[in-house]
Each structure stands twice: as structure tokens, then as C-alpha cells.
């Protein structure tokens, strides 16, 4: 390796010397021509001959160096290929268990076994899906429908709007007093009452709160609250009476 590097440095130095010698003689030849020296002048002939020889030497050395570089490039290509083969053989040696001729047969058998198990799994899933479609679990039974209906009715009862009414009442001095009366549905209780058979029964009682607000001419507000428990069946009558 060191010998090759030294040889390359030596050949590059020789090529540079040939190039410099050619440049010097060529410049001297052109200088004589610019001075009007005849081409048959002995001095011109000597300088021109030296320049031509230097040019030939430079070209020969350049071709030699180029051939040398081409040879070196070829050897590197071959060496690179050899190194590649060595690395490939190393990888194959490490994984030599994968080079078993029976490996392909084993792989095929394993793949068939996997596919067979996947088919069994898919068939099981199809059977489960079919059973789920036959058994309709989306419909509600009577007990569930009754419970759902009760919840809906209770929700509507709790969301009853407030009934409000405002009136204008005259006073003894001829002034007007504003009287506002509001009815609120404040809640629902489940009361247990005994029956004739001795069994308790559940009775829904709704609390109806009536608020009467009186605004006097002098700006004084008076509010009167009245609370009354009523059953759902007479809720509308209570609301009308409170108003």
C-alpha cells in the first residue's frame, strides 16, 4: 500500500515537470516569433525543437499516468467484488440453518396449518353472528316498556311550566297596585297509604306552590307564598285555581 502511494507521488511529480518544461519552451518560442525572428533562425529552431519534445514528453507521461489510474480503478472494482462475496458468504454462514433444503416444505406446511386455523376462527365468528341475528335482543319486554313509560311521564311532570298572572288593582287613593300570582310545580313525593285490604298502596302527591307578589305605588313589594299538595289527576285544576 505504501509502495503504491510512493509510486503515485513520483509519477505525479514527473508529469508536473514535463508540463512545466513544455510551458517554458512554448513561451520562449512565442516570444521569438513576437520579436520577428525568422523560423529558419538557428536559435528559433533550437527553442522550437525543445518545446516540441517537451510537449511530446508531457503527453506521453500523461497517457502513462492515465493508464495507471485505469488499472488501479479496475483492481479496486475487482477487490470490491471480492469483498462483497466475502460478506455475503459470512451472512450465509451465520444463517446456515435457513439453507436447509427441507425449509421450503416446512414453510408450506406451516402456512397451510395457519390458514386452516384462521378458517376455523372465521367460521366460529360467522356462527356467533348468525345466532345474534336470530335472537332479537333489541326489542323491549313489557316490564321494560312500562318502566320507560313511567320515566317519561315523570320527566314531563317535572318540566311543567310556571303559570303566571298579573293583575292591576285600584287602591283607596285612586292609585294602581300591581298584583302578580305565580304557580310553581316544586316536586313530587310518593306517599304510602293503607288500603281496605291492609296492603299499602303508593300515591303520588305533587307540591303546588302559589306565590302572590303585590307591588305598591310607593315601591314596597309584598310576596305571599301558599303551598298545596295535589295528586297528578287534579294537577290541571289546581293550576287553574291557583291562577
Swiss-Prot record:
Task: Indicate yes or no for the key word NAD.
Answer: no
Family, as annotated: Belongs to the alphaherpesvirinae HHV-1 UL14 protein family.
Q: Which domain of life is it from?
A: Viruses
**Name of the protein described by the UniProt record:** Tegument protein UL14 homolog
How does it get modified after it is made? Phosphorylated.
Write the record's keywords in alphabetical order, separated by commas. Answer: Host cytoplasm, Host nucleus, Virion, Virion tegument
Compartments annotated for it: namely: Virion tegument; Host cytoplasm; Host nucleus
Role this protein plays: Contributes to the nuclear transport of the viral transcriptional activator VP16 homolog during the early phase of infection. Therefore, participates indirectly in the regulation of the immediate-early gene expression. Additionally, seems to be important for efficient nuclear targeting of capsids.
Q: Which GO terms describe its cellular component?
A: host cell cytoplasm; host cell nucleus; viral tegument
**The species this protein was found in:** Gallid herpesvirus 2 (strain Chicken/Md5/ATCC VR-987)
Q: Where is the signal peptide?
A: none
Amino acid at each position: 500500500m505504501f509502495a503504491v502511494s510512493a509510486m503515485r507521488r513520483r509519477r505525479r511529480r514527473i508529469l508536473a515537470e514535463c508540463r512545466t518544461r513544455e510551458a517554458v519552451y512554448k513561451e520562449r518560442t512565442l516570444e521569438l516569433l513576437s520579436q520577428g525572428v525568422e523560423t529558419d533562425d538557428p536559435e528559433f529552431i533550437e527553442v522550437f525543437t525543445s518545446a516540441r519534445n517537451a510537449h511530446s514528453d508531457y503527453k506521453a507521461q500523461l497517457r502513462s499516468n492515465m493508464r495507471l489510474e485505469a488499472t488501479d480503478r479496475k483492481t479496486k472494482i475487482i477487490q470490491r467484488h471480492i469483498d462483497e462475496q466475502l460478506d455475503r458468504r459470512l451472512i450465509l454462514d451465520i444463517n446456515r440453518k435457513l439453507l436447509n433444503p427441507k425449509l421450503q416444505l416446512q414453510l408450506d406446511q406451516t402456512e397451510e396449518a395457519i390458514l386452516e386455523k384462521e378458517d376455523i376462527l372465521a367460521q366460529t365468528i360467522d356462527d356467533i353472528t348468525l345466532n345474534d341475528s336470530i335472537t332479537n335482543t333489541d326489542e323491549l319486554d313489557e316490564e321494560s316498556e312500562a318502566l320507560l313509560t313511567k320515566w317519561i311521564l315523570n320527566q314531563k311532570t317535572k318540566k311543567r311550566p310556571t303559570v303566571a298572572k298579573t293583575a292591576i288593582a285600584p287602591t283607596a287613593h285612586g292609585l294602581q297596585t300591581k298584583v302578580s300570582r305565580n304557580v310553581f310545580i316544586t316536586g313530587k313525593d310518593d306517599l304510602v297509604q293503607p288500603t281496605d285490604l291492609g296492603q299499602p298502596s303508593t300515591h303520588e302527591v305533587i307540591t303546588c306552590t302559589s306565590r302572590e307578589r303585590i307591588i305598591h305605588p310607593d315601591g314596597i313589594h309584598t310576596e305571599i307564598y301558599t303551598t298545596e299538595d295535589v295528586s297528578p289527576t287534579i294537577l290541571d285544576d289546581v293550576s287553574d285555581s291557583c291562577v
